[in-house]
């Protein structure tokens, strides 16, 4: 009986350690001295290498790396595709369960980085400071997403390799999803299999 109790206690301890505190993002500790960390997005359409920019969007980059660090983006879907506009993901698993979210980050859209083709930016709702896990790639130059009189959408990186993957994505058909009722959902699911932090250079 004592042995069983010790085993149960050990299992509970491991579970407690394994649990992620979603109030304490860890991205700022990832390659702390690297201002331009790179990640590889392994998707069902192909691989994309993105260089993140801490000099312009440290909060957004650290936020993104917090999700990468706990593998929150693994086996998620790009749930929104507007072929001449954006492809958006980071919010839902393949079964459409929501990704657990860290606290929202402050909007850094005034950093000078533009929503141009191949850039990655934080998705949000009408509240300019509501960005959490979701992000999008610009499939075109989208100056309407840059700040003007109102807050824009924070660009925090740029594709370095894999532009052809965006071109493939732009050709995919979309529909209204029967389960969710959402429009602009890719007919052929675009799966984000894994996001891999690249070795520091």
Locate the predicted segments by residue:
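Cyclophilin-like peptidyl-prolyl cis-trans isomerases
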Residues: 17-201
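Bacterial N-terminal signal peptides
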Residues: 5-15
């Amino acid at each position: 009986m004592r042995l069983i109790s010790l085993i149960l206690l050990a299992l509970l301890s491991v579970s407690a350690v394994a649990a992620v505190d979603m109030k304490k993002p860890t991205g700022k500790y990832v390659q702390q001295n690297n201002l331009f960390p790179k990640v590889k997005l392994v998707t069902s359409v192909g691989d994309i290498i993105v260089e993140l920019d801490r000099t312009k969007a440290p909060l957004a980059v650290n936020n993104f790396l917090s999700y990468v660090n706990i593998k929150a983006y693994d086996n998620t879907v790009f749930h929104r595709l507007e072929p001449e506009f954006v492809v958006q993901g980071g919010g839902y698993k393949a079964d459409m369960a929501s990704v657990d979210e860290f606290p929202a980050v402050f909007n850094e859209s005034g950093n000078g980085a533009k929503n141009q083709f191949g850039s990655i930016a934080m998705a949000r709702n009408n509240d300019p400071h509501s960005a959490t896990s979701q992000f999008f790639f610009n499939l075109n130059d989208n100056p309407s997403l840059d700040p003007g009189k109102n807050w824009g959408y924070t660009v925090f990186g740029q594709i370095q390799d894999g532009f052809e993957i965006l071109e493939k994505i732009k050709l995919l058909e979309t529909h209204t999803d029967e389960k969710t009722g959402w429009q602009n959902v890719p007919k052929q699911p675009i799966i984000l299999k894994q996001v891999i932090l690249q070795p520091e250079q």
